[in-house]
């Protein structure tokens, strides 16, 4: 208890700080989610991986205003006839340098050497697994997508490989073999095709694309990996508010690690507004050393829940 809380004003009849108003109407209810946010993405989209720190912060601070729906967009069906002339990509090995460049710029670690010796031959395969997991549990599907991205970008695993996918799904507490097999049946193809149709109806051509739509079916489209301010501004615009949105306090690092299992330094920096050299002490102050392991990959630190 501080001293100013003990001060009682005879004029206002208040013990403590009166503030600007002695009579005002307040609303303690959380705002209803009036906005649908479509996140159109792909498991091997490098700029989607780069967006992870900002997207998490956006959800942590402003998730009370929107309902997020992840939509698979279909980046790579196969290498047969594929060419991205604008980015100089005509074969799998051409992707490696592009990925490393994105990783170095964003500081979300990307190895990329698998494109030389064990390339992902289709992103549709992990996308279909995502859709089957989503049928069982939306949150587990999001966790699957995160684990798949960790595997392919940071740890250089081919997430089109059946055994890799089975292992990722097993770690979710599900039957990996059964789900991966189901994903290749008609149902898996149909579910993914539905996402593709939705992406087309939203006018999406590149990833990541975030589209926010309000109750009047008016929308804002933001293409590419952008700073947090872009998404906040888009949300304010679609809500039609002239007042700044109320940013919620992010979950503690301990709670976040319990939920996520693995966090890279860049993600911690962005979420908690830290400089890179502050991360180590921040982790030490927030989590017991018995609860996490600190490691490094491609020059970037990360923590894993024990």
Give the positions of each predicted feature.
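C-terminal cap of thioredoxin/glutaredoxin-like
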Residues: 4-15, 52-58, 150-306
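A short beta-strand-turn-helix
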Residues: 18-35
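Short active-site neighborhood of thiol/selenol oxidoreductases, capturing the structured segment around
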Residues: 31-46, 52-55, 68-72
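An acidic- and aromatic-residue-enriched active-site/binding cleft used to recognize and process polar
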Residues: 42, 73-75, 215, 225
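A short acidic (Asp/Glu
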Residues: 49, 80-83, 221-224
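Structural alpha/beta surface segment adjacent to cysteine/selenocysteine redox centers
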Residues: 52-153, 265
